[in-house]
Amino acid sequence: MAFTLTNKNVIFVAGLGGIGLDTSKELVKRDLKNLVILDRIENPAAIAELKAINPKVTVTFYPYDVTVPIAETTKLLKTIFAKLTTVDVLINGAGILDDYQIERTIAVNYTGLVNTTTAILDFWDKRKGGPGGIICNIGSVTGFNAIYQVPVYSGTKAAVVNFTSSLAKLAPITGVTAYTVNPGITRTTLVHKFNSWLDVEPQVAEKLLAHPIQSSLACAENFVKAIELNENGAIWKLDLGTLEAIKWSKHWDSGI
């Protein structure tokens, strides 16, 4: 169902990152009411740039590390909801690419996303009298087919796709819809230099970047298009400047 971002309130976790910042720039062009950015490190220059792009949009920043206990996330969300009353969209975008850091990769890329999602359900779940909401989770094309030299990173992204697809199926119960946007290799600092698991391929970044990649702006433009298309359960591939809905094959069914 098509969705207009005009006058909406959006929370963007990691909205100042490589793809995140360019996506934030595209979002403010859509005349949001509020863009609330949650990120680990404040970037006043980037916040000022976002405000300058569209002064009609209120842009606010809160420091947030997705690896904090879920109670801290809930406390922060209470502050945000008290200020805005309603939130329409949550974008979960935190991610690291470093297979030396196994525990942190899982904590940031998957556990943090699950916890942030779980926390906002306290405010959105229609079983608790909530209004529902929209969750946009950033996965990766490696969630479809791994970069096998970084199996930890790729595994977390596969988990994001599976978790989000489950959320989408739960929408009739919770009132919360969900979909993933899954970028291909994108020109950001994330991929300039990173470590493979157990150092199985020391040149993994260089080899990857030898192939065609997309700009973060091209990715951001399609990212916002996916938000506007607002298809519950969609698995979007954002690769080489294109936006494509992935058809997921079913190989097993729980039957429940």
Curated annotation (Swiss-Prot):
Is Oxidoreductase set as a keyword in this record? yes
Which domain of life, per UniProt?
A: Eukaryota
Originating organism: Drosophila orena (Fruit fly)
Q: How does it assemble?
A: Homodimer.
Q: What is this protein called?
A: Alcohol dehydrogenase
Q: What is its EC number?
A: 1.1.1.1
GO MF terms listed in the record are: alcohol dehydrogenase (NAD+) activity
Q: Which reaction does it catalyse?
A: a primary alcohol + NAD(+) = an aldehyde + NADH + H(+); a secondary alcohol + NAD(+) = a ketone + NADH + H(+)
What residues make up the catalytic site?
Answer: Y153 (proton acceptor)
Q: Which Gene Ontology biological process is one annotated for this entry?
A: alcohol metabolic process
Query: What family does this chain come from, according to its entry?
Result: Belongs to the short-chain dehydrogenases/reductases (SDR) family.
Per UniProt, substrate binds at: S140
Indicate which residues the UniProt annotation says bind NAD(+): 12-35
**Does the keyword DNA damage feature in the UniProt annotation?**
no
Ordered alphabetically, the record's keywords are: NAD, Oxidoreductase
Q: What are the annotated GO cellular component locations?
A: cytosol
Gene3D superfamilies on file: NAD(P)-binding Rossmann-like Domain
